Amino acid sequence: MANIKSQIKRNKTNEKARLRNKAVKSSLKTAIRKAREAVVAGDVEKATTAVRDASRQLDKAVSKGVIHKNAAANKKSALASKVASLQA
């Protein structure tokens, strides 16, 4: 345990941020999984809406600083290409 007052405060804020980031990442993984499952099922309409929702959540995670923008771009690109392969 820290003895310095400012470090005790930092520990509290870091813990809050960790829990917030964990919640965002968890919902993000769920959205991506739903999109992948819709693609595997072959439902084009459901897949496009799921990918749109996942892309939106990825962008929000980037703006909150939870994930890097390039990581989000890679995930969005992969999901979009899977949906495009369904439509072709």
UniProtKB/Swiss-Prot annotation:
<dbReference type="GO" id="GO:0005829">
    <property type="term" value="C:cytosol"/>
</dbReference>
<keyword id="KW-0699">rRNA-binding</keyword>
<dbReference type="InterPro" id="IPR002583">
    <property type="entry name" value="Ribosomal_bS20"/>
</dbReference>
<protein>
    <recommendedName>
        <fullName>Small ribosomal subunit protein bS20</fullName>
    </recommendedName>
</protein>
<dbReference type="GO" id="GO:0015935">
    <property type="term" value="C:small ribosomal subunit"/>
</dbReference>
<keyword id="KW-0689">Ribosomal protein</keyword>
<feature type="region of interest" description="Disordered">
    <location>
        <begin position="1"/>
        <end position="27"/>
    </location>
</feature>
<comment type="similarity">
    <text>Belongs to the bacterial ribosomal protein bS20 family.</text>
</comment>
<keyword id="KW-0694">RNA-binding</keyword>
<keyword id="KW-0687">Ribonucleoprotein</keyword>
<dbReference type="InterPro" id="IPR036510">
    <property type="entry name" value="Ribosomal_bS20_sf"/>
</dbReference>
<dbReference type="Pfam" id="PF01649">
    <property type="entry name" value="Ribosomal_S20p"/>
</dbReference>
<dbReference type="GO" id="GO:0003735">
    <property type="term" value="F:structural constituent of ribosome"/>
</dbReference>
<dbReference type="GO" id="GO:0006412">
    <property type="term" value="P:translation"/>
</dbReference>
<dbReference type="GO" id="GO:0070181">
    <property type="term" value="F:small ribosomal subunit rRNA binding"/>
</dbReference>
<comment type="function">
    <text>Binds directly to 16S ribosomal RNA.</text>
</comment>
